[in-house]
Amino acid sequence: MFSDTHFHLHYISEKTGIQEASAILSGMALAGAEFGLDIGTKADDLLCRRDAVMQAIALLPAGQKDAVEKFLCFSAGIWPGVDSIKNREACVCELRSQIEAFTKPGEPFCKKLVAIGEGGIDHHWNPSGVDGRCEDDFDAGLYEGERELFMMQLSLAKELGLPFIVHSRDGFEDTLDCIKKSGYNRGIIHCFSYGIEEARTFLDMGWHIAFGGGTTYTKKSKMPQMEELLRFVPEDRLLLETDAPYLAPVPFRGQMNTPLLIRHTYDFIAKIRGISTEELCRIVDKNCAELFGIQPAGV
């Protein structure tokens, strides 16, 4: 019933173990998930992510295995971490190698690589965060390297004919400039964090907009603008995601997020748009099928 266009199952399994990842996949199967996209962030993570998923699936009953193998898809991409930026050419070469091995006929999930990403621009400075991102470390070389890494991946997506999952945080102008220079406008602006005018720009270029659990705990003073934005995005460009294990929706804020919690984001956004949760599911499922060129799991 629910589609989730962005989660990191490998991060969840690293935190909690394969059995918990298996339980999450089981829950998604029992809930009738239509589409789930496990997102890549490192040049060399695609094959190990697939192998971890295979271990998790092996713990499931036969009927659930079939369901997971139908709804679960993968992306491959390089998040703009400092090390990846500094070694961008080698990283993109490794990414290509991983994609070639993953898509080799006869390999598990060989036809389930449906996107490149996530990659993009991140100028949210958080020295205590996972990446230890500090503005003082970002000299002119790193700024340009980040842009180059993004555009190299956009070129790869264009070459392979796959949608691109854009990570853009506090970097709208650079993101827009890179996309324009690449000439490629197919994919998702994930975990959208800008306003209506920025959304309009991306939409006019052909991009989809994805919202996550962060919408549910928007500050009260900013909620009118958030509601306006959630109503502004047209039906045929709207997608929903968890970004699990991050950004758990209310009432689970501060806890580890999983794709099983996406119902709360659907309920929240459906209410704002004045439609039923079931209708919103239908809309998002259709958009996923069209963007990624897949048949919905329930068909």
Residue positions per predicted region:
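Mid-domain alpha/beta scaffold segments of enzyme catalytic cores
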Residues: 1-299
